[in-house]
A protein has these predicted regions:
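Short, small-residue-biased leader/transition segments that mark boundaries at the very start
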Residues: 1-7
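Generic hydrophobic alpha-helical segments
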Residues: 8-11, 141
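A short, small-residue-rich loop immediately preceding and capping a beta-strand
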Residues: 11-33, 44-49
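Mobile "lid/hinge" segments at catalytic clefts and subdomain interfaces of large enzymes
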Residues: 36-175
């Protein structure tokens, strides 16, 4: 909430900034970061999506774990079992849910808008490929600055139309 609302103000308060990189993952933070970056019309911006959390090698994935409360209430799990399943649901640090919910959808839409590098959405969080995407994003925003390309040049009506078509094609979340 407050932290995200302040982002555009904080970005503008940095007199020497030449570009902005946003790093975000989840349901609320990623769309809010996209809005903040989109408001930086005269600056180059890029989003590094947080990727997807890897599923556990043992236990249940995040989608199934969301039902532990109901299963506990129905005496299908003990409190200890529920706690253990919850702790094992994520096999990598960071990242969004392991299903195409709001966080994953927002990552794909950010890429379709041109705010994120191609093939950066849903990269496995914390893995070498995600770290490489982060490095490439930093290089890309420097290149945008070197060529005078700003967010206004990227977020066009065509970019928004592209994002809508991509969203419809992959059937992303509409929450």
């Amino acid at each position: 909430g407050v932290q995200t609302c302040a982002l555009p103000i904080l970005i503008r308060s940095l007199p020497t900034r030449r570009a902005v990189i946003g790093v975000a993952t989840c349901d609320k933070g990623l769309p809010a970061t996209m809005i903040a970056l989109a408001s930086m019309h005269n600056l180059p911006t890029i989003l590094v999506p947080g990727g997807a959390t890897l599923p556990p090698t043992f236990g249940e994935d995040a989608g199934k774990v969301q039902t532990i409360g109901a299963r506990y209430a129905n005496h299908e799990l003990s409190l200890q079992e529920a706690a253990e399943l919850g702790c094992r649901a994520c096999a990598s640090p960071g990242g969004g849910c392991q299903f195409l919910g709001t966080a994953g959808t927002s990552q794909v839409v950010a890429e379709a808008l041109g705010l994120a590098l191609p093939h950066s959405a849903l990269a496995p969080s914390g893995q070498d490929v995600w770290l490489e995407i982060s490095r490439q994003s930093a290089r890309a925003v420097v290149e945008l600055d070197n060529h005078g390309i700003t967010t206004r040049d990227i977020l066009t009506d065509k970019a928004i139309e592209n994002a809508m078509v991509i969203h419809a094609a992959f059937g992303g979340s509409t929450k």
